[in-house]
Amino acid sequence: MSRPRRRGRDIHGVLLLDKPQGMSSNDVLQKVKRIYNANRAGHTGALDPLATGMLPICLGEATKFSQYLLDSDKRYRVIARLGQRTDTSDADGQIVQERPVTFSAEQLASALETFRGDIEQIPSMYSALKYQGRKLYEYARQGIEVPREARPITVYELLFIRHEGNELELEVHCSKGTYIRTIIDDLGEKLGCGAHVTYLRRLTVSKYPVDRMVTLEHLQTLVAQAEQQGVPAAQLLDPLLMPMDSPASDYPVVNLPLTSSVYFKNGNPVRTTGAPLKGLVRVTEGEDDKFIGMGEIDDEGRVAPRRLVVEYPA
């Protein structure tokens, strides 16, 4: 007879984890889920095992709104090894080509300029994008290359930090769907020497504050402190969470009176004053502006529910 499945806590919010190097995003996610004893958890855009930095982890009802973070812009610091190209475009891969590094400062500046603004990027075979139902990296590991279409991305800012010997350091502020490994690989080809990523750190996601990032070690320390103090771990862990609607913080807010919000929460579009003419909105209710979900302005100017918060008993 199987044991009943243990139910986790109904905890809702977003943890800004400083992902350590060498772990997959999913491994980190599962550790955080266990530490918080959360019944649901999901991350908002994977980081490669080699990469470190900001990985927002959504707990509970916040998972419903993680898509809005996937769509947000991000900022990275990257160090590239020049003169070597690898099959994965990073240091975890096998070197497939070595060439001398002979470009000038002017050639580097000219090459960097071609990656700024609206550009198209062909994703790496070592990515989680899917082709005919399978992830690209699954084909790549079998030595199979499949066709990939170029995708539009925007590089808002590409800052040159330093070039010393065979190392090049850059900072990149980019749109969703941008592969930093691919930018480095393409840059290496444009410079005629090849390149791959040796260090990658995600500095920011959307407008989340950098000083709210926490490490796995810090979470584990808090759990140990709670045990020593004889208090629930949640008492020390939960204050670290950002609000559950923070993934959608870029969207305008529409506040509904309680007389209207009851219909909205039952799945019905409602009319209200002060709403924008179109687009997605964060919806709150009452004088305390309690977040109740995401809505969208329909053709009649009403706020139609798109994703609703399930209200759990206190």
From Swiss-Prot:
EC class (word): isomerase
Gene Ontology biological process terms, A to Z: mRNA pseudouridine synthesis; tRNA pseudouridine synthesis
Matching CDD domains: PseudoU_synth_EcTruB (cd02573), PUA_TruB_bacterial (cd21152)
Binding residues for substrate: 43, 76, 179, 200
InterPro entries documented for this protein: PsdUridine_synth_cat_dom_sf (IPR020103), PsdUridine_synth_N (IPR002501), PUA-like_sf (IPR015947), PUA_sf (IPR036974), tRNA_psdUridine_synth_TruB (IPR014780), tRNA_sdUridine_synth_fam1_C (IPR015240), TruB_C (IPR032819)
Catalysed reactions listed for this entry: uridine(55) in tRNA = pseudouridine(55) in tRNA
Keywords per UniProt: Isomerase, tRNA processing
Record bears the keyword Isomerase: yes
GO molecular-function terms, A-Z: RNA binding; tRNA pseudouridine(55) synthase activity
Entry annotated with the keyword tRNA processing: yes
Pfam families per the UniProt record, alphabetical: TruB-C_2, TruB_C_2, TruB_N
Active site residues per record: 48
EC number: 5.4.99.25
Family matches, as NCBIfam families: TruB
Task of the protein: Responsible for synthesis of pseudouridine from uracil-55 in the psi GC loop of transfer RNAs.
Assigned protein family: Belongs to the pseudouridine synthase TruB family. Type 1 subfamily.
PANTHER family associated with the record: PSEUDOURIDYLATE SYNTHASE TRUB1, TRNA-PSEUDOURIDINE SYNTHASE
Protein's recorded name: tRNA pseudouridine synthase B
Source organism per UniProt: Salmonella typhi
